[in-house]
């Protein structure tokens, strides 16, 4: 299956501490993916993850239309959202647009506490939206729960709430990068075609982390390799992409070593 993780807009209303939006040294294009670019995505990929590195997909001004197009092309989609600053009617429109979409709601803690990390989030409102998606629209939903000190004692209660609601429950123990004191095998996931990333600039990238390290891969973010100017097949089969994959075998970028390390002898 050909998969891509899209950053379709530059907008988000949250101030999550771990998000690259909060790093003022990180620059990104303030633009939305165009309908033409999205057509090219749907014509190549079988599955789309709407899981922005700097954005929440619900803020794309044509998001409902994008969801409709994906469904018409038989492209499966996962929508990752944590923001809560849309009217209920807007969520209804999105749920109507693609009943086959899988929605992942980022509520990190009991709904009343999630804002402690997801600053500006109304977790209780978002929980009600998730309930509406499941009850009224029969949407396949997952409650995603990142574990922090403030919410680790509430995991079992939240899991019970998810079970009562009839939605899946997924926990994440987050870590940014790897422990430099330990020895790791280098296993870049992009080599097995697991999932391609995407930047708000309109460029496809080997993985989602690459957006934060574009200065290390200037050859992949040239204008002629953007979705505005080229189709997906020509981009991923370009000499620049082939050269990058070859470089992984001899001289990989530092960020690849950081995010693609697996502890030796781990199960």
Regions found by a protein language model. Name each.
Residues 1-102, 113-124, 128, 136, ...:
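Conserved alpha-helical substructure of the radical SAM core
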Residues 6, 10-13, 184, 250-253:
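Processing junctions and N-termini across compartments
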Residues 7, 44-52, 76-80, 99-109, ...:
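Conserved C-terminal portion of the radical SAM core fold
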Residues 16, 23, 194, 211-212, ...:
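Extracellular/secretory pathway and lumenal proteins
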Residues 66, 74-80, 92, 103, ...:
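Catalytic cores of transferase enzymes with a strong primary signal for eukaryotic protein kinases
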Residues 128-140, 160, 164-180, 203, ...:
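C-terminal accessory region of radical SAM enzymes
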């Amino acid at each position: 299956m050909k998969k891509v993780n899209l950053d379709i807009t530059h907008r988000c209303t949250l101030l999550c501490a771990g998000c690259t939006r909060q790093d003022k040294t990180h620059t990104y294009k303030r633009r939305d993916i165009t309908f033409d670019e999205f057509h090219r995505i749907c014509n190549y990929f079988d599955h789309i993850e709407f899981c922005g590195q700097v954005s929440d997909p619900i803020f794309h001004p044509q998001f409902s239309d994008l969801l409709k197009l994906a469904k018409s092309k038989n492209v499966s989609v996962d929508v990752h959202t944590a923001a809560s600053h849309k009217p209920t009617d807007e969520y209804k429109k999105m749920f109507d647009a693609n009943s086959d979409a899988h929605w992942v709601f980022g509520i990190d803690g009991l709904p009343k506490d999630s804002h402690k990390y997801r600053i500006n989030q109304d977790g209780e409102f978002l929980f009600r939206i998730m309930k509406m998606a499941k009850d009224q629209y029969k949407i396949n939903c997952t409650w995603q729960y990142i574990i922090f000190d403030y919410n680790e004692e509430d995991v079992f209660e939240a899991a019970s709430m998810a079970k009562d609601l009839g939605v899946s429950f997924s926990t994440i123990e987050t870590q940014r990068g790897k422990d430099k004191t330990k020895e790791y095998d280098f296993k870049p996931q992009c080599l097995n075609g697991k999932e391609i990333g995407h930047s708000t600039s309109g460029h496809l990238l080997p993985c989602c982390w690459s957006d934060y390290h574009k200065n290390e891969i200037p050859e992949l973010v040239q204008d002629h390799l953007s979705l505005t100017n080229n189709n997906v097949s020509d981009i991923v089969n370009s000499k620049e992409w082939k050269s990058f994959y070859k470089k992984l075998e001899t001289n990989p970028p530092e960020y690849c070593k950081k995010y693609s390390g697996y502890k030796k002898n781990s199960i």
